[in-house]
Regions:
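C-terminal beta-strand edge segments of enzyme domains
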Residues: 197-198, 204-341
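Short polar catalytic/cofactor-binding loops
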Residues: 8-14
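Short beta-strand scaffold segments in enzyme catalytic cores
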Residues: 80-82, 93-97, 131-133, 224-226, ...
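Short amphipathic alpha-helices and their capping/turn segments at secondary-structure boundaries
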Residues: 21-35, 153-162
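Cys-nucleophile CN-hydrolase/nitrilase-fold catalytic domain and related Cys-dependent amidase chemistry
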Residues: 16, 25-110, 172-197, 201-204
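CN hydrolase (nitrilase-like) catalytic-core segments centered on the catalytic cysteine
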Residues: 61-79, 146-244
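Extreme N-terminal starter segment of soluble prokaryotic enzymes
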Residues: 1-4
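Active-site catalytic loop in hydrolytic enzyme cores
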Residues: 61-64, 86-194, 259-263
C-alpha cells in the first residue's frame, strides 16, 4: 500500500520563506501520519498571482532553500512547485519531485494559459520536455502542472512513458457558479470530469492537488482528489478548506486494470507518429492530405471515388516535387511538399 497525502494549502503571495516553513511543517505532519507521497499545489512555495514578483521569488535548482527543503524528504516522495530560474535567466513554473534528500526530477509547465484572467506568458517561459520518472514508491510518476492536463496528449504520453501514477499540481481559480453543476462550481465539475477520464483512458492513478485561499482577489477552490485506475474517486477533499488529506492506495490496481483493459498495450504509436507528422506539415502548409489531388483541399481517409489502384499508391506530384516513397514505413521521412497558392 502507498499512502498519499494532499497538502491543500493557501500559500502567501510572494512570501517564499513563510511558505517554505509551511511546507516543512506539513511534510513532517505527513511523515508522522505514515505518508509515502506528499503533493503540494502549483506554485505552493510562492503563490500564484506573482506577475512582477516572479523574478524576486525565482530559485535555481541548486538554491540552498530548495536543497534544504529536499533534505527534509528522507524516506519520502514529495512534489513541490515553485518558480525556477534557468542559467540563461528564463523563469518557469516548475514542479519538482524531492526524494530521499535530493531533487530527483523537475517538470517545467508546458502550456501557459494567456486568456481570460490568465496572463502567464507575460512572465514565464514554457517548458518543452515531458518525461515520466521512476520513484522510490516502486511506480513511475508522471508530473504535470495545471493547464498541461487540458491537453490530452500530456497524460497519454506520461502513461506510455511508464507512469502508473499521474500527478497534477494546480492553482485553479473558482469560476462559473451554478447550481446545475454537480458541485455547484463549473471549474470543479470540469476538472473532475478530466481526472476521471484520464484515469480510465490511461488505466493509472490520478492525483490532483489544487490550492485554496485568495491571491489578489482571485479565489482558489481546492477540491483535490485521488482517482483510481478505473475512474473511481478514492479521495475527494472539500472545496475551499485548507488541510492535509490522506488516502491509502494499492498500486496492484494498476496491474489488474491494465490486464483487464489493455488500452495502453493496444495504442498504435507508429500510426500516431506518422499521422501527427502529416498534420504538422499540413498545418505548416508544406504537405497535402495523403488522399487529396494536388490543388484540392484535404479529403477522406480513402478517397471514395478513387479506383483501387490509386488507393494503393500516393498521388502524383508536379514535376520536380518528390512524392512519398515511405511505402508505409513510419521511420521514413515525410516529404516536404509545399501547397500551391
Amino acid at each position: 500500500m502507498v499512502r498519499i497525502a494532499l497538502a491543500q494549502i493557501a500559500p502567501r503571495l510572494g512570501a517564499l520563506d513563510d511558505n517554505l516553513a509551511r511546507h516543512r511543517e506539513l511534510i513532517e505532519e505527513a511523515r508522522a501520519g505514515g505518508a509515502d507521497l506528499v503533493v503540494f499545489p502549483e506554485l505552493g512555495l510562492t503563490g500564484y498571482q506573482l506577475q512582477d514578483l516572479a523574478a524576486e521569488v525565482a530559485m535555481r535548482l541548486d538554491d540552498p532553500r530548495l536543497t534544504t527543503l529536499a533534505a527534509a524528504t528522507d524516506a519520502l516522495s514529495v512534489v513541490v512547485s515553485f518558480v525556477e530560474e534557468s542559467d540563461d535567466h528564463r523563469r518557469f513554473i516548475a514542479a519538482a519531485l524531492l526524494e530521499d534528500g535530493e531533487v530527483r526530477h523537475v517538470h517545467r509547465k508546458l502550456f501557459l494559459p494567456t486568456y481570460g484572467l490568465f496572463d502567464e506568458r507575460r512572465f514565464f517561459a514554457a517548458g518543452d520536455v515531458l518525461r515520466a520518472t521512476p520513484s522510490r514508491l516502486g511506480a513511475g510518476l508522471g508530473i504535470a502542472v495545471c493547464e498541461d492536463f487540458w491537453h490530452l496528449g500530456v497524460p497519454q504520453l506520461l502513461a506510455l512513458d511508464g507512469a502508473q501514477v499521474l500527478v497534477n499540481v494546480s492553482s485553479s481559480p473558482g469560476r462559473d457558479l451554478a447550481a446545475t453543476h454537480e458541485v455547484g462550481l463549473g471549474t470543479a465539475s470540469s476538472w473532475r470530469n478530466l481526472m476521471r477520464a484520464y484515469a480510465q483512458l490511461t488505466t493509472s492513478f490520478v492525483v490532483f492537488c489544487n490550492r485554496v485561499g485568495v491571491d489578489e482577489s482571485v479565489t482558489f477552490w481546492g477540491g483535490s482528489e485521488v482517482i483510481g485506475p478505473s475512474g473511481q474517486a478514492i479521495l475527494s477533499a472539500p472545496l475551499f478548506d485548507e488541510g492535509l488529506f490522506t488516502v491509502d492506495v494499492s498500486l496492484d490496481e494498476v496491474r489488474r486494470e491494465r490486464i483487464s483493459l489493455p488500452l495502453l498495450r493496444d495504442e498504435r504509436l507508429e500510426w500516431q507518429l506518422r499521422e501527427l507528422g502529416r498534420v504538422v506539415l499540413e498545418r505548416a502548409g508544406m504537405s497535402l492530405d495523403s488522399t487529396a489531388e494536388w490543388g484540392a483541399p484535404p479529403g477522406f481517409d480513402v478517397a471514395p471515388d478513387a479506383p483501387d489502384d490509386r488507393r494503393s499508391r500516393p498521388p502524383a506530384a508536379p514535376d520536380g516535387v518528390p512524392t512519398d516513397t515511405s511505402n508505409g514505413d513510419p521511420s521514413a521521412p515525410i516529404p516536404m511538399r509545399r501547397r500551391r497558392s
